[in-house]
């Protein structure tokens, strides 16, 4: 990623894997953060829940007994204490909230932000949005924003009204896109909602992000996860991967 010109990676932490590995923090996160820091790059630690943190509902929720909100608080207490003096770490508190009202999500987000700050961590916190991290309308509930906090958005080709959803907020709030991408016609995908092209989706969306100075993380630097940037290993890029490399190369040249 960094050789391609990027300056940040997003590391998803699966709650079930974390639950069953007492050394997860040291075995994985510490090593990634150290490696990135040695090259002056950032790591976004993404707590990878997708669903309702209050009642645990959602088709993609992990098979563990803990209440998601309580377990999220436990994770962030431990993680914030561990990395509070590590400046290249960014905390993304919850991947994709689903099935809850704006006010309910605001209460959940406020509680997790408080846990992180109470642990002494002052780094940037990224807060997602309801409806699979797409509906920024909940920001109307905010009032005064927390210090050093940004708000994330996930956009794929099926979200055809993304500009309408973003336009009312990009000039008023610090927005960062922590997932976006598409699967071109050179790859087969299980999720047809990811199908898109450079011209119809990629150029339009990336140009909008550049115009409004919005940071982004492309998904996924992998050949298994969809939409993948690589084909059957890490040697040959998909059309999507080539487009990301072009975007990052352009940024590198401009700097």
Question: What do these predicted regions represent?
Answer:
Residues 58:
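Short acidic-hydrophobic catalytic motif
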Residues 63-69, 73-90, 94-252:
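Extracellular glycoside hydrolase catalytic/binding regions
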Residues 19, 53-55, 186, 226-227:
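Short secondary-structure boundary/hinge segments and terminal tails
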Residues 1, 250-255:
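Extracellular cell-wall/glycan-interacting regions and their flexible linkers
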